Each structure stands twice: as C-alpha cells, then as structure tokens.
C-alpha cells in the first residue's frame, strides 16, 4: 500500500505519495492529463531549475527573499541540475499550454526539498512556500518561456553547432582530398558536363556553412528572456531591477549571452524566436537530406549502380540476401530530416496560434524544438563518424562513366557549334558509337582535333573546392 501525505493548493487538499517531493498541483496534473508517453524534456527541466536558481539569488540580493531560504532553494536547484530527483518531474507535454503545471512542479519540488534542507518537512507544514518563495517575482507566463529559451540556446550552442562544424570539417577535408578527381556531373538525373569530386563535395560544404550562419543569426533573439514580464508583460509584482539582474545571473551561471527581452509583451505573447530558429534548423535538415541522398546514390551498387564512391560497410543489410550492405547512415539521416520537417509544421502552427498576451502552445513547441536539435546533432555525429569520414572514391568506376558520357560533346560547342555537336551525340547514342567515332564518321573533325578539344580535365573550370 502506497503511503500518502496531504498537500494543499487553492483548490483544496489532495493526497500525494509520501515519498515524492511534488505537491498538489503536480498531482492534479498527473491525474487530469494521462495523455501519451511524452514527458517534459530533461533539458527543459534543468532550464527551469536554472531559472529558479537565478531568481532566488536575485530576490535575495534585492532584499526580497531571506538568505536562508534563498540558499536552500539554490541548493535544491543544484541537486536537480546534478541529476538528483529526476523522477520528481513526471508531467506530460500535453498539459496546459502555458506550462504552468511544470512550473509548479518545479516550485513544489524545490520548496519541499528546500524545507528539508532547512530542517523542516515536506508538505503543508514546509518552511519554504512554492509560490511565495520559489516563484517570487515570477509567473508561469514568464518563467516557462524563459526556460524554453535557456534550454534551446544551450542545446544549440553545446550540441548542434559543434556537430555541424565537425561534419563540415570532414566534408571540407574530403573536398580538398578529391580535388583532382574528374567525374561526370548529373542534372535532372541525367548525364551532364564534368566536374571534380572535390567540387561536388564543396557544394555540400557550402550548404552546411550557410546553415551554420543562419542558425547563428537566430541566436540573439533566442537569448532574449521573458523573465520579469510576469503575467502579461507589465512586470507586475517585480522589483524595477529584477528583470535585468536575473538575466545577467542566468548569463553568468550558464556562460551564455542571455539578456532581458526589451519587449516583454512580445516575449510572452509569441514563440517567434523559436519559430525562426527552427526555420534555420529545417533548412539544415533540407541540406542534410540532399547530402545523404547524394551520398547513397553515388555509392549505389556495388556492381549495378553508380558506384562512384565507397562508404563504410557497417552492418549486414538483409535478412535474406547474403552479403548485402546498405547505406544505413544515409537512411537514418533522411528519416530524421523528415521528422524535423514535421516538427517545423507543428512549431509554426503553435507559434501562429497564440492569442492576445500569451502563447499557449509552449510545451509542444519546446518539445519539438529540442527533439529537432537532438535528432540533428546525434544524426550528424553518427553520419560523420560512420559514413562521411570513410567516403572514398572509386577511381576506376569514375573514369569508366566519364569516358562513356555523351555530354563531353559540350566541349565542341565553341568549335563546331551546338547543332553539329548535338548531331554527334545523337548519332553516338543511337548507333552505340563513341563520341570520337561519331564525330569522325560525320566528317566534322579529325581524331586529332577530337583529342585536343574533348579533354574532361579542362572542362571543370577554375573553381577551387571550398570557395
């Protein structure tokens, strides 16, 4: 039999498991929102703890909170940040759209734990109050968006950007290493004029470099914090210096460039910063999907596909076809990119649907945002380690396909004109001839002229990979 204790909120008393630190409002949420399995992300829980820690420190500094209470709240928050009490945050994403219940979940846990630190008990006789002390100078309406931005910015800076930079570096190295390998290009899935493998990969590098700039450009808006706006953005019940000082405290303890939002009404009423930042992440997903698809097409085979590059063979690919090996890293990346694009639709809908002074789609928005960051960061790390770093050219196959291409005839345009060059290509294709044989048979040029004018290595231009 589960031992319980009585907890009380503005709606009255309710029984709570005696071994849990949470209180009445958390218990009500557990009972009223038994929806699916998605819980508040751990990084969001930690961001809430950071927010409460900073608020307690600033409230103490401003003379609004007793030093012993502030110290106990800070210690309790540090325990949460250290990974303790992880099972004290059981609430579903699918709850109130303001995140109020998760804010109160944190308030109740920290209040009960702080009370114990001060020698008191958890429950209605506790020494620290979840609203009056832990939530002092705050509202769920400014706390939750603040925690969203803290979690989002830290995830981008600490996880996604390093992995994006690492993958970019790997592909840049490959681009330089393969700069002298001339291969056939392809447009519309048809043969086109030559380029080097290094040039082809340099396009991927530039895509990722642009994506990094777009993501970094979104960070200053994400760094703006709503804390201090309280209920509707007016700052009701806060000290005049509170908003600025609490943002500075969060910047200090996270070593991140957080600032107080210049307009708290925007900060509470919208999720625009995360909508825009996620748009940059969706752009990254689009680029990664293109790169992964190019890699698996170029590596297709081993005997009946394009086969211009080889990628690492990591695991068996079929339960029925012996010896088959598949481009599994590419497949994982393309799947997660699809999920990111779906997340973007949900975030756009949530961001567009806030009414008046408060957006109430916040738990869904941050859940999808953090999932996107995790998927992209983990996906790039895996793709880099198990695929991109092991890409190698199949020089024999590249040369074979290059020599068989009819599009080398493009080099003759400036010598004999487009129409005659097209006639050479069509005759070669129809009769199964080489371009040279077709050109000589038509009498448009000699063997020597063909060899002098149709030189794939001179058709790739002067574009240096990486520029």
UniProtKB/Swiss-Prot annotation:
The record marks 331 as: Important for catalytic activity. Its EC number is 4.2.1.2. Substrate binds at residues 98-100, 126, 129-132, 139-141, 187, 319, 324-326. Keywords: Cytoplasm, Lyase, Tricarboxylic acid cycle. It comes from the Bacteria. One of its GO terms (molecular function) is fumarate hydratase activity. Belongs to the class-II fumarase/aspartase family. Fumarase subfamily. Homotetramer. There are 2 substrate-binding sites: the catalytic A site, and the non-catalytic B site that may play a role in the transfer of substrate or product between the active site and the solvent. Alternatively, the B site may bind allosteric effectors. This is Fumarate hydratase class II. It comes from Salmonella typhimurium (strain LT2 / SGSC1412 / ATCC 700720).
